[in-house]
Each structure stands twice: as structure tokens, then as C-alpha cells.
């Protein structure tokens, strides 16, 4: 608990009945609240570029997602991990995409997606917690920074951010104007409960205003009608995964004229120590959900023309070892892969200073060697897309990074 919250609770002790009523009030705001359609300070205006960051937590196997099938050492280095249930989706003579990434492959073909391979952080150890802290903070060592690079970037651009989560992730922390949104697990409040809250809040202008705003936002939400539809009236077909649902909602928020300029989504489950060779195993299933979510994001933004002004960056905290382990999975590594997509991306290509897969070419004889600093990718996107000055990128967004030159990955 936040110490300030503890002080407030101690100062205003609550009876059980009062606690229940405040719990009910939380249910109202949780189930009513949605992204505002009115103009907000810091909100992006019509025609403003949008940025989406997708964090794959757990350490994506870059050679599984984007296999280097043309590398002469690929088959021997990967063993059973180099065999796929369906042919990999070839991108160029050296690289392909996992057969689960059908939509992403189509975007590469349409020159709306690019693959950055052998990419990674300055951090070279294999701890999830430390690597994710470096990934999100933008530092070179774990815990040297307590705010996030995207939060600092939004301060520099004066823009609003959104986390599709119940809390603000480290990458967005700082002094930026950031909201959060996540699907409510609570039922919609009854009319009687809302009426009781209105009476209780009548003497408190701030609470009364907040309740009315939540009700209005719920009514204005792009998906309010769909959310309220009975189960029997929902679209046919299997229930979409959580990432697909969040991607659709993110697209709606970003497409609004006064929506956020940047949004962050997360997917867990990429720590694939076992069962990677299974066509329905964790890697293949995760990539399918990622692929469907990215397609949903594109479809939602394309409808209003916002896709042409959007850049999506997909990253993970580290890659995995090149060789298979004893449980047909992979262990923590270093070098990995990042994906860029969107109408603003100069796609149709693989960006890689390829180090090779022979044992002597690997980092510590185990991992894909990092030849591209992930900060170069991020600095290129932030500079070209959000128009953040080089001096801010070098000193504030990614401190002491002047030697890391930005990659030009977006359309001119």
C-alpha cells in the first residue's frame, strides 16, 4: 500500500457498511469509466503521429519468431527447434517468420513492417527482472533510473500516454500525463446503486463531478454498446484472446481525434523453457495471439486513416539461447528480435548486422550476439515520429547515449 493511502485510510476510518459502499463506488467507476472523448490537456490532435509499444515479457526466442533459415549453420545450431509444422514464411534469402505470423508477414510484403534482428540491450545478463527494468527505464544498468524512457519522451513532446493495464508500467512512469485502462472484471452497477451514490455524493462537488463524468464517459465509450450486449448477441466465433481485445480497444482510443499519442500493451508467457517444438505449444500459441492482436490494431486504426500515422514497436527484454535445451525449449539468452510496423514504417525489409550462428560466433558460445543496440531503434522512432530533439534523446530520454546513433526506420 502507498504510505499516503495508509495515512488517508487512518485519518478517515470506515465502518463495514461504509467500506462496502466505497467498494460499490469503485465498481461504478471501474465499470463505467472509459477513455474520454472530450479534449484533454496533453491529448494528441487530429493528424498527430501515434506510437504503440508492445512489450513481450519473458524473453522472446528471436530465432523462433524470425528464423535465419538461410544461415548455413541454422539447421545444426537449432536442431529440432529449426523444424516447423508448416513452412516458415520467407522474407528474404536469409530470414523468415514463424508460420504463426501470417498477418505480420503480409504487412512485411506490403512494406508496412520491418524486422530488426540481433538486437538487444546494453544489459548482457539473463535476469528477467533486471532486463525488464533496463528495457523500460532506458538505462544501461538495472535500477539506475526510476522512471521510464517513454514517460520522459512524452514529457519532452508534451503528449498524453495510455497504458492498457491496471497500473502504469515503468516505461511510462515519470511526469507524463498517463492514463490506464483495463477491462473491468466487475458487473455493471445497478441503477439503484448509482442513485444511492448520487445522493451520497450530492454534498461533495468533486465526487459528484467524478461520478457524472464516469457515467458520461461510459455512454461515450466506442465499445459501450458492444460491452453491454447480451452474450447471445455477440459475434460468432471463438472468444478472442486478451491481447486481441486490448489491441482493438487501443486502436479505438488512438483513433479518437483527442486520444493519446502513445499507448503501451503487454503480453506475458514468452519464457519458453519447454515444449517449443509443439505446433500448439507456448511459442506458437503466443505468436498466433500476437499476430492476431497486431492485425486487430491495424484494422482499427486503418478505418479512420490513423494507421498511416502510426508506428508500432514490439520488443522483449532479451532473446534466448541458440540451442535447444533438454525439455525442447530454450533458456535465457541475450540477442533477440524486434518488430516495427505501421503506415509510418519503411517496411518490407530485415535490418540486421548478422553475426552468424556458428558456436564461435555466438555470445559466450551460447546466444545470438547483439550487433544492434535497441536504443538505436527507439531513438530513431522517437526522433522521426514524435519529433523529439536529438539532445533530449541523448541526455534525458536515454541518458548518456550520444554514441548510440538512431536508426532511420520510418518513412521520410
Description of each model-found segment:
Residues 263-266, 311-315:
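Short, conserved beta-strand edge motifs with alternating hydrophobic and charged residues
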